Regions:
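A short helix->loop->beta-strand "cap" motif at the edges of active sites that frequently abuts
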Residues: 156-161, 233-236
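Conserved post-catalytic alpha-helical subdomain immediately downstream of the catalytic base
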Residues: 264-333
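Catalytic-core regions built around general acid/base machinery
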Residues: 146-159, 181-188
Length: 340
């Protein structure tokens, strides 16, 4: 099996213990994360060869970050070194009616100062079959939109499948900037992952009769959105995650995969959330796993949705679920009974 390549930032996650608010915290738990890294790590845990490409400084904190990738057998051979710092991501976990909060401190990170010469795409893609990036990556630095475009062109020349998660972050760039950049990248993309907010914010495409704050989700509206995206940008497969928010602790979760002019919905899961950060990344990993293994469209969306459901019951950003765990949930085993 050839490898899946992910390209993006790798940052330090700090969060208070349990459900403490920032103002209550006198210590923080440490983890290392990044959207594309989470996808690679989840896939590696499922047995898929992966390579994560980023840029990290030459210091002890970066070495700790690398050790996390080593632990899960994620390839690091093409990580560039240099720059001053690793970005930081603070997470305050919400509960019930209190939402989670996130604070970023990632300006001037090594990755944000990336230059085209830091990445040899010929070498990176030498034994790859899939390339994954998100809309976070081009938002992080002046040169990164061009670097992403160069990577997409190199992948496309080699017949490598390309997936992208829109992942719009309003504190990184404006809607106008995001739309302008992503519309240049999307023609290269084979599989696009989004949610209803991303589609509206970045592409100005909206789901009819849907209120994400009330948990009201209209299936026909999402099919309309997926079709518009597919038709406008020539994208073969569009996946949309559907989150109905009951509270910060309880969500309904399902997904739509639109491919070949047909819509396929997964079953819906009611999740008591443990940690929703990384839920979209685990969905992306499940989607990629399914597609490289040749699953049909319905099985693909069921697997991706179930994988992501399991992730949101796991602390921190990475889905540490094996394919057998996912298939068990798909088969109806969601009781949570002790396995002996």
């Amino acid at each position: 099996m050839k490898k899946v390549v992910g390209f993006g930032d790798y940052i330090l996650r700090l969060n208070p213990e349990g459900y403490l608010k920032f103002i209550q915290a006198d210590k923080f738990n440490v983890f290392y994360t990044g959207a594309e890294a989470n996808v690679c790590t989840s896939l590696s845990y499922m047995g898929v060869p992966t390579e994560f490409v980023t840029r990290l400084p030459e210091n002890a904190i970066a070495e700790c970050a690398l050790s996390t990738l080593y632990k899960y057998r994620v390839g690091t051979h093409h990580i560039a070194r240099g720059g001053e710092r690793i970005g930081i991501f603070y997470v305050e976990k919400g509960a019930s009616q209190r939402p989670s909060k996130v604070v970023y401190d990632r300006k001037y990170s090594s990755f944000s100062a990336s230059l085209p010469e830091h990445y040899d795409w010929n070498g990176i893609f030498a034994d790859a079959e899939w390339f994954h990036f998100t809309g976070i990556t081009p938002a992080l630095g002046d040169k990164l939109p061009g670097i992403c475009l160069e990577a997409c062109r190199a992948a496309k020349e080699r017949g490598i499948k390309i997936s992208c998660d829109l992942n719009y972050r309003k504190n990184l760039w404006s809607r106008k900037e995001a739309k302008q950049t992503m519309e240049e990248l999307l023609p290269y993309v084979d599989v696009l992952i989004a949610n209803e907010e991303d589609a509206a914010d970045v592409l100005d495409i909206h789901a009819s009769n849907t209120d994400i704050t009330s948990g009201k989700l209209n299936r026909e509206g999402y099919i309309e959105v997926a079709k518009k995206i597919s038709d406008k940008y020539g994208i073969g497969a569009v996946a949309i995650t559907l989150r109905g928010s009951i509270s910060a602790s309880e969500n309904d979760w399902s997904a739509l995969l639109y491919v070949g002019g047909e819509a396929h919905f997964s079953k819906q899961y009611r999740i008591h959330l443990v940690d929703r950060v990384g839920g979209g990344d685990s969905f992306g990993a499940g989607l990629i796993y399914s597609m490289i293994n040749g699953f049909n469209a319905q099985t693909t969306v069921e697997f991706a949705a179930a994988a992501s459901c399991l992730k949101q019951t796991i602390e921190l950003d990475v889905n540490l679920s094996k394919p057998a765990d996912v298939f068990a949930l798909m088969g109806g085993d969601g009781s949570g009974r002790v396995q002996r």
